[in-house]
């Protein structure tokens, strides 16, 4: 697996922690688990086409560090005027797929 390759990951769950904080759990398919192993402090880069624009944003991983995770959680803070964060808070649903770069 190449570390720099976007992978489609399914949204497993969404949890509102605060009015501005959203925790997104992403399911990691077995074939990609080694490439999504991480150390504390690393992040995932998410890519999404929003309003005809390809948007890439890094989000910190807030899961327990493991070498071959079956899922990962990231935190997305809603930023006023933020294209990706606003979309995630308003449109993202369980079952959606996101393009994600490994840590």
Regions inferred by a protein language model and the residue ranges of each:
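Ferredoxin-reductase
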Residues: 2-97, 101
């Amino acid at each position: 697996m190449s570390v720099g390759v976007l992978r489609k990951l399914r949204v497993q769950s969404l949890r509102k922690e605060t009015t501005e904080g959203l925790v997104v759990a992403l399911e990691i398919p077995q074939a990609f688990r080694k490439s999504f192993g991480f150390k504390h402090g690393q992040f995932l880069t998410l890519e999404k086409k929003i309003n005809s624009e390809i948007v890439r944003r890094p989000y910190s991983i807030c899961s327990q560090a493991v070498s071959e995770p079956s899922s990962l959680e990231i935190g997305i803070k809603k930023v006023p005027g933020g294209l990706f964060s606003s979309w995630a808070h308003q449109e993202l649903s369980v079952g959606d797929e996101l393009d994600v770069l490994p840590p």
